[in-house]
Amino acid sequence: MEGNITDGLKYVGAGLATLGMIGSALGVGNIFASFLDAAMRNPSAAPQQTGNLFIGMALAEALGIFSVLIAILILFVA
């Protein structure tokens, strides 16, 4: 009986760990929305800001990848 409860709680914990993907998706959407807003206001400055755009996107996506890694660790290691 206890093995089933711990397995169930493991799945709940892994599901809760993947909620970090929501923050990652919101962050990437916010980054691109801000970039497009700024590019429409000043099109000549957009090419210089493209590098910053991709750095911000990579950092925001890293949080989502970390949350998936935590979920995998909870499922298979814990």
Swiss-Prot record:
NCBIfam families cross-referenced by the UniProt entry: PRK07558.1 (NF005733)
One GO cellular component assignment for this chain's record is:
plasma membrane
Q: Which family does it belong to?
A: Belongs to the ATPase C chain family.
What molecular function terms (GO) are annotated for this protein? lipid binding; proton-transporting ATP synthase activity, rotational mechanism
Compartment(s): Cell inner membrane
Pfam families linked: ATP-synt_C
Give a short account of what the protein does.
Answer: F(1)F(0) ATP synthase produces ATP from ADP in the presence of a proton or sodium gradient. F-type ATPases consist of two structural domains, F(1) containing the extramembraneous catalytic core and F(0) containing the membrane proton channel, linked together by a central stalk and a peripheral stalk. During catalysis, ATP synthesis in the catalytic domain of F(1) is coupled via a rotary mechanism of the central stalk subunits to proton translocation. Key component of the F(0) channel; it plays a direct role in translocation across the membrane. A homomeric c-ring of between 10-14 subunits forms the central stalk rotor element with the F(1) delta and epsilon subunits.
Query: This protein is called what?
Result: ATP synthase subunit c
Q: Which cysteines are joined by disulfide bonds?
A: none
- What positions are marked as the site Reversibly protonated during proton transport? E61
The subunit structure is: F-type ATPases have 2 components, F(1) - the catalytic core - and F(0) - the membrane proton channel. F(1) has five subunits: alpha(3), beta(3), gamma(1), delta(1), epsilon(1). F(0) has three main subunits: a(1), b(2) and c(10-14). The alpha and beta chains form an alternating ring which encloses part of the gamma chain. F(1) is attached to F(0) by a central stalk formed by the gamma and epsilon chains, while a peripheral stalk is formed by the delta and b chains.
Q: Any idea which UniProt keywords this protein has?
A: ATP synthesis, Cell inner membrane, Cell membrane, CF(0), Hydrogen ion transport, Ion transport, Lipid-binding, Membrane, Transmembrane, Transmembrane helix, Transport
- Which residue ranges run through the membrane? 16-36, 57-77
Question: Which PANTHER family does this chain map to?
Answer: ATP SYNTHASE LIPID-BINDING PROTEIN, MITOCHONDRIAL (PTHR10031), ATPASE PROTEIN 9 (PTHR10031:SF0)
Q: Which InterPro entries match?
A: ATP_synth_F0_csu, ATP_synth_F0_csu_sf, ATPase_proteolipid_c-like_dom, F/V-ATP_Csub_sf
Q: How does it sit in the membrane?
A: Multi-pass membrane protein
Keyword Transmembrane: yes or no?
yes
Q: What organism does the UniProt record list as the source? A: Hyphomonas neptunium (strain ATCC 15444)
Coarse class of the protein's main subcellular location: membrane
